[in-house]
Design a protein with these regions (language model features):
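Flavin-dependent oxidoreductase catalytic cores
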Residues: 1-325
Length: 325
C-alpha cells in the first residue's frame, strides 16, 4: 500500500462535516471529501466561511459549475479556509445537474472545463483534480474522456478520479446510473496506461476488500463511497488489510468518541437528527442492526438527549464477515 491512497467519495446529503468527523474516528488514513457544492451555493451561503477542522486533514472540496470566473472567485476563499484540494465534478448525471449545465454533460465541453481549471490555478496554489466518467451514453469508446484529459491536463490538472462507467443522461436516475452502465475497469486501466505522468484513481463498484486489493495495484489509489456509508465498519477492514493497522476499535468506543464531538454542538442547539443520522449503519450486518436503528430513531423522533446513545445494549452476536472476504 506504499504511496497508494484511499478516498471517501463525495456524496450529496451524506459527506457533511458531521459524517466526516464520524469517519475520522474509524480511519486516520482515508482522504476526505465534502459533498458536491455548486459555485453559486458556495458564494452565497455560509459554506464560504467554513474553516476546515484539524481532524479533517486531507480534505478535498468538490465544486460544480460551468463559469470559470466563479471557480476562480471560490478558489481563493477555499485555499484560505484550509482545504487541501479542489475537485471538479464532471461526472454527476442527474437531471438537475444537467439542466444547470454542469456535471457529466461537461464531458462534451473539454475546453470550457480547461478554462475552469486554468482560472482556479491562477487564483490559488491548491492542486486541482477532476472526477468524471468513462464517457456518455451507450457508446464504449474513450474519445470524450481522452479529449477532456488532454485539454485539462495542459491547463494544470494532474489527477483524475474515474468512475469506471459511462453516464447516461436524460433517462436514468443517479441511482440507476450507478447500476445499469456496466463497470469497465479494464478501460479505466487503458486510460491510466495512456497517461504515465498523471494520477488516476479508480471509482465505482468497489465493495469488497479483495476487489480493492486486486485493482489498487494498477492505479494510484481508489475512491469508495456507498459501501463505506452503508457499512462504516468496513473501514476497519481497509485499515487492517491495506494500511496494516490491526488496532481493534469497538462500536462503544466509536460512539463515545463521536459524542465528544457532537455533544457540544447539541448543547448549542444543533439537531440530534443532523448529528446522529449518519450512525444508523454502525451495526450493519450484525444481529443488533435492527435494534440499533430503532433505538436511534426513537432518540431522533422524540428529540431526546443524544447522550442516550451511550445506553444502547448490543445483542449477543457473531458478526457475519462473509461480505468482507
Amino acid at each position: 500500500m506504499k504511496n497508494k491512497r484511499i478516498y471517501l467519495a463525495p456524496m450529496v446529503g451524506r459527506t457533511d462535516e458531521h459524517y466526516r468527523m464520524f469517519i475520522r474516528i474509524l480511519s486516520n488514513n482515508i482522504n476526505l471529501y465534502t459533498e458536491m457544492i455548486t459555485c453559486d451555493s458556495f458564494i452565497h451561503t455560509d459554506r464560504k466561511s467554513y474553516q476546515v477542522k484539524a481532524k479533517e486533514n486531507n480534505l478535498t472540496i468538490q465544486l460544480a459549475g460551468s463559469d470559470p470566473k466563479k471557480y476562480g472567485y471560490c478558489a481563493k476563499m477555499i485555499e484560505d479556509n484550509g482545504y487541501d484540494e479542489i475537485n471538479l465534478n464532471i461526472g454527476c448525471p442527474s437531471d438537475k445537474v444537467v439542466k444547470g449545465e454542469f456535471g457529466a454533460c461537461l464531458m462534451n465541453s473539454p475546453k470550457l472545463v480547461a478554462e475552469c481549471v486554468s482560472e482556479i490555478k491562477r487564483s490559488c496554489d491548491l492542486p486541482v483534480s477532476i472526477k468524471t466518467r468513462l464517457g456518455l451514453g451507450y457508446e464504449e469508446d474513450l474519445d470524450l474522456l481522452y479529449a477532456l484529459i488532454d485539454e485539462t491536463s495542459v491547463a494544470g490538472c494532474k489527477k483524475y478520479f474515474i468512475h469506471a462507467r459511462n453516464a447516461i443522461l436524460n433517462g436514468l436516475s443517479p441511482k440507476k446510473n450507478r447500476m445499469i452502465p456496466k463497470l469497465r475497469y479494464q478501460d479505466a486501466l487503458i486510460v491510466k496506461r495512456r497517461y504515465s505522468d498523471i494520477e488516476f484513481y479508480l471509482n465505482g463498484g468497489l465493495d469488497d476488500i479483495s476487489e480493492i486489493q486486486n485493482n489498487i495495484s494498477f492505479f494510484d489509489g481508489v475512491m469508495i463511497g456507498r459501501k463505506i456509508y452503508d457499512d462504516p465498519m468496513f473501514l476497519r477492514v481497509i485499515e487492517s488489510e491495506l494500511f496494516g493497522n490491526k488496532d481493534i476499535i469497538t462500536r462503544d468506543y466509536i460512539v463515545s468518541e463521536y459524542l465528544k464531538y457532537a455533544l457540544p454542538l447539541f448543547k448549542k442547539g444543533a439537531s440530534n437528527y443532523m448529528l446522529l443520522r449518519h450512525l444508523f449503519s454502525l451495526y450493519y450486518n450484525t444481529s443488533s442492526s435492527k435494534k440499533w436503528k430503532k433505538f436511534l430513531h426513537d432518540i431522533i423522533q422524540h428529540d431526546k438527549d443524544i447522550m442516550l446513545i451511550n445506553d444502547f445494549e448490543e445483542s449477543i452476536y457473531e458478526e457475519n464477515i462473509s461480505s468482507y472476504s
